[in-house]
Amino acid sequence: MNFLSAIESRTAQAASSGTTLLPQFRAPSWQTGMHSSTATELFVTGALQTSGTFPTSALTAYQHPNTFSSRNFATTPSLALQDGTFSAATNGLLSPHDPLLQIKTSQTPTALTFERIGSAVLSTSIPQSSTYRSAQESAPHLLQPQFSLLPSALGGTQQPAQPYSTSVFTGSTASIERALQRECSVIKHHQRPSSTQSVQAQLSGTQHSLPNYLTSVSGVSLHDASRQSSLLCAPLGALTHVSNGGPVQKTSQVSVELSQSYPSVIPSPGYPPSSTKSKNCPTKAPPRSSKTPKSQSVVSPELTQSYTKSSQNQSSVNSSQAQAFSTAQLPSLLSVSQPPIYVSTQSPNLPSASQSQVFSTIKTEKLPPLYKPLTVFSSQSQTITSGSQTLSYSSDQSLSLSSVSSETYSDQTRDLSSANQSQSYSSNNSQGLTSVSQSQVSYSSQSQVMSPVSPSDSYTSGQNQTLASPSLPFSTSSRGQNLSSSSPTQNFISMHPTPNTQDSTSPQSQKFLPSVQPSSFASSPHSQTMQNSRTTADSKSYVKRKSDTNLYASAKQEEKFQMQDLQALQQTALETATPGLSEGELNTQETAYSVSKADDRYSHSVIKSNSRMEEQVLGLQGTKKDERLISPVGHMPQHVGHLNNSASHDGKKNTDLIQSTQVSAKDLSQHTMLHKVLDTKMQEQPSTSPQLQAAMRHSQHLQLPGAQVLLDSGCDLQMFQQSMLQSNMGQTKPSAQMQRIQSPPQVAHPFLQMDGQIIQSNGAQSQQSLHAQGSDVIKMDTSNGKHLQQHLHTKDHFSHRGRLDSKNQFDSLNPMCFSESMLLTDERNFLSHVDDILAATAAQEFAKSSNEENLSVKNQDAKSRFQSLNVRHMSPNFTPPKPQNMNNLSINGSQSAVNLSTVSTTQPKNVSLDQTHIQPMEQDLPSGMVSPVPGANQDDHEKNSENIKNPPNVNQEPKEGGNIQEEVGDAEFLSNNKTLSEENTTTEGDFIMGGDENAALGQVQSHLSKIDPQAGGSSTIEMEEDCPDISQDGQQKGKDKMAIKQFTEDENANLKQIKRNMPLKRSVSKGPDVPGAQYSSHVSEGYYDSYQHQERMRQKIKEVEEKQPEVKTGFIASFLDFLKTGPKQQFSAPAVRVPSRVRRPCTPVIRPPCPGPLSPQSVAGAPVSDSGSASPPKKAEEDLKKNLETLPSFSSDEDDATVGNNDLQKSISTALSALDENSEKRLKTEGDKAALSAKQDPSTPRNGQDKTKAPESLKPSQPEATQPEQLAKSQETIAIEGFTDEENTESGGEGIYRERDEFVVKIEDIELLKEALCTGKEPPAIWKVQKALLQKFIPEIKDGQRSFAATNSYLGYFGDAKTKYKRVYVKFVENANKKEYVRVCSRKPKSKVLQPARTTHTKASGGSKVSETPPPKTAPPKVVSAKPKAKPQKTKAEPPPKKRKQWKEEFSSSQSDSSPDMQSDEEEFAPPPPPIVTRFLNTRAMKETFKGYVELLVGLTLDGDMMQNLEKENDDVLLPHMRKIEGMLNENRRRLLTKLQLEQPLKNALENYPDFAIISRETKSKSAACKIKVNGKWYNKKTLRPAKNPSKQSQEFPVEPEKSQLCSLYHALHHYKYHIYLKCKEEVSSVQKANRDLKQEELVNHCLKNIKWVEDLFEKFGELLSRVQQTCS
């Protein structure tokens, strides 16, 4: 059921795509009713049968990401929602209470499904979509119902779908029925069946095929519901009608009615009946499905007939049936694929039907019966293609094909249409969508409709031109591709065309795909199905592809593009689970299948999983696209050629591809269509020609990749980990399809089976091989070889097309992908990390998973693997590489093994083409990771795929089975890995690395390392920043980046080297950083090394666990840490943690301090730490402490830990230091340790701290040892309370006087202290008052001066004890080595007034915080000044020791210049560094001081003689505040003066005139002239009263522009007191107006009670000082 649900979710997403289409069709009605994007998509497919409009709409949806970059909302929301949808329903469909359902009218649901489809379409059709979407949400079949709607319109297509469903249902009838029941309930909620029925009836009337399909669909899952909701879905013309529930029997109006039907589908009212009927259908559907799985596909006409009845009933049922069908398909990822295959079978024209299927498939996972109908619909859609609905969804193409294109376009036109639409679609998913969006019957003329897909409008212009013959293009490529674009499956279609039209459609497809992919990951399943569809639609071309695998012979026939052949091929394709499709678009398809599978599972398991898959896929697509984007358009042609070559690699496909480079022959069946369309379109539309060509190129390269991407998206989301791994090669997916057909029961294992099926589907690519290989794994492997070829093609196509597309449409699309994928990625990463952590719990499991992962990575290629992981996090960047999706799986876990295989195979070709681009882009890395040599890669990949066949199984099992299975799979994986490493070393290398990393502690880390290389290669920078995985394996990341970069180049240069690197990476995985470094450098190190490494790691881990039992539980702790730190650390958290714990003894500290920079070193360090677990106790202790400090960051310590975790580290270190300081001995030993660590870890930032600590900590010990011999400089006088004659005079000397720090000395020791300081001998200790405690400060010698260092000894200070001590005045010298150093003042410092108030704060903060700040301060003074500056602001009442030290240093330099009076105040309050100032300003003491300053000025406004009176009385309350503030201002002013060399006249003017203005005039000369104008009344500086008027009221001075700001600051500082005085005057006057009877004191208090006003002044004061500090720094 998980798988079904995944498919359903995919379908829902695809449907949402359709929704977007509909709005463009029928903006008014659809928008409101089609909030469920999915439904809309389906509906569109059905409703827009004749016109390519709907497919175009889908295209818009897909395209819109590019076209409507601004529509990212759809994409992003859709991603999020999509995930939600998947998660909620587990189906990927929305559960009845799913937000999407609830959001019927909201755009979010649409966005959800649309996320994959395209934000533009989504946004357009959100309203419409909501209903449809709601239906989807309520039940998987809902999406299907939408599809049903389409199917209804395409009744003819329905039957084939049903047979397909049947086959699917055979395997999972029970689950399907369950799903159908659910769907039924959902349908009830949404009553879409009625609409579907009406559409069905209409379609039936107009096109028996479509009606049949509809009947078939509704029959399968929504017989009754269909009647209820028939009107809803069916009446294209009667959109309004939909509510009727009465089937609109305007089948003849299929085109129009479909359109209406779509709207009706959207309305939730109609949908509910559909749901109800759905229930009935589910039971029927399974039988039907089982009855005519492939047969019906083949017998599209028969199916049509047989389903005709159903169709009528099942108008609404269609939706549910679609779901049922999907459900049937669901049994395997292929199930999604299957409907597409069915569509393919139904008719190459029926790609749209296929699309429908795709959605159905998606839904099928959830509701087999419903999905079946959808599938059926898909098939019929082909027939109905001409029928309005064919275009609808699955039959966007189908529709075009059937109705519009079917006859004229059927062969050529259809091809063109497909190419066109595909192109238009791929060029800008939106483009295809544009037509669809038109969705008006207009779409019927595919060309226009494509254009109409406004979302793709902008895109459309480019692609639409291609679509200039949209109706035709839509029909041909449309089937798979256009439909994809037109319906929710637009994405899928796009994807499908991509595979089908590897060469010709690929560009469009991929273009579309990328855009759709991001927006409609849900479409991914669609895509997958769509892919099949497209394959089917391009059934000729795709069937050819199939024929490459199983239908290679047929493929050539398909090339003829005969409808029957196409249908037969489609059916065959369906039977083969789109093996042909998988062959050419296997990657796409497999991705799609993967998606369905993954979707289902992920939907069930976690939204994150789903979104992650989606994100990964998106990211991968984005990456690939990016890569492809990187490649110039010129490259696109190369890719196209390459694609053709790739197609030839596919085998028979090659001939066709070569024959029709435009069409891309078999492999590019759709591609050929695309090419034809392109050619035709070019002929038809010269203006479009360039874009079309580009699109064509894109489509060639895009189609496979596009399909892959879409499939990957869906696949990645749901199946990414398990299914993708299993279908590591695209082959797995075809295999799945085949398996689906062959063994529907496999659905029993929703996930494992899916994986197996997917593998079979991939095998289906090498259909014969897959079928021959009974086992999923074997199938996957076999298909792996072929799929690899196809994948290579795909990757090449994708690469080219991705790059072009990325540039053309994916620019906007990428952002969508990025946002979605990023969102999904984070969630998924989180989940996957959790899985990794759990897996890591057992070292063996870890090692196994590592092996598995390594295998997957190997298969995938370093590039793929890295990219996929990165894709997850950085979808946009990684999106380009299709293989990455599979890589993502590998990254997720053992799953990746299969993916790698596929990716490797597929990517190798791309590598050669992409390699060029890879270096420029992310793909660069992925490509590099794959195999640089296309030919060699192909062979290698084929071999690898075969070798991987078993590993994929293992991967699948681990995926499905969980950790246990992972272990088993890992075991197999290890053996397989060797083969992979040998044959496909490049891909294996990554996995190997992963394995080692897992062994080293972590699948997570291995994932990270894999990701990192990809990230480094693909978007090294972005990956690091955006990809949690990358950042997680910070060490690896750093190295991987470099390694990846090198690797990319190396890959391009040496395929073998890359392969070696992969194994190396595995071995390197030991050290998170090492893997990356070794990655590129150690090519020769083989899989064995990594395996041995894993073994060593296991042993070490075991040893560590024995020695440190906490290590076992450490994973839990690390997991918690991971939860705290976030997904970025997830991957590395488990992996790093174990090593981290093991390493802690060694040099873990190094890592946190220098995550990024030390990545290589830290990698080396990590292994060292692992090996060093048995290092000396001292070292272990030291490392332990360091580790504790690093703990917070050790998840992402490699890269992001430094910045993010510095605070945590410091706080931890502070806590440690506080504990350590309990004994002086500890401090000393700590100092020694610090010295050692400093020596050991010189490169780490921490080493700086250690160094500082070491010397400082050693110094304390030195003084004691050397005290007898050494004498400190003598100090004649000591400032002791009651003993000093000079009061309020500058004490002089170094250090900062802090009034709140109260130190005392025993009365009996005073004389001793004086004598000792005078002679330089060791004096008695002094004590710091800490509330009721006294902290002992022992004498030490620092720089020849006598100082006192803090200890952890305390005495009570209360009661009589207070009478035994006298206060001694000290200055804070520094805080080093976690110790506070002070010196006794020779004279009493001036500002003692505030001591009482501050002492309290100081005691608390001094005691508790001093220890904290000192540790951070261990860093070099400069660093400290920087960091403390930031921190100080947070600490309110504590003027941290760091700050004090800085003040000391900075003031010591300027003390001689400043007056003694100002110095002491300024030292504390006006530290030169602005950060210090701000920090200081944030302290309570500073606020109190400033408040006293304001109080004095307020009183001054009321009494002009107040200042003189205070001075006479020597006031110790307000004057000290005044002096402090003025001291700060004067010190800053002096600092400014040193920088601002003013002429005396200007200086005098600035100091005399209180008003200041800058007059700047622009002149023709190079520099603008600047004048300073000063004016205002002079005033007395003491009383602030106006003085005699100046001779001139104002003066102007010309100054350099850069000096004007300095003059402004100087003026503000000089007149600050006066300006505040004026503000106080204003405040007092305002208070007096309100309260005239207040006395002077009351007035002052009233003003000060205005806290906001006072704080505002305080903030501005701090800002002023900060500006000065920044200017002077």
Swiss-Prot record:
Compartments (UniProt record): Chromosome
InterPro entries to which the protein is assigned, alphabetical: DNA_MethProtect_Complex (IPR052466), DUF4211 (IPR025451)
Residue ranges with Polar residues bias: 289-309, 459-539, 947-956, 1259-1272, 1397-1411
Basic and acidic residues bias locations: 1222-1233, 1435-1451
Keyword Cytoplasm: no
Domain of life assignment: Eukaryota
Protein's UniProt name: Glutamine and serine-rich protein 1
Organism of provenance: Xenopus laevis (African clawed frog)
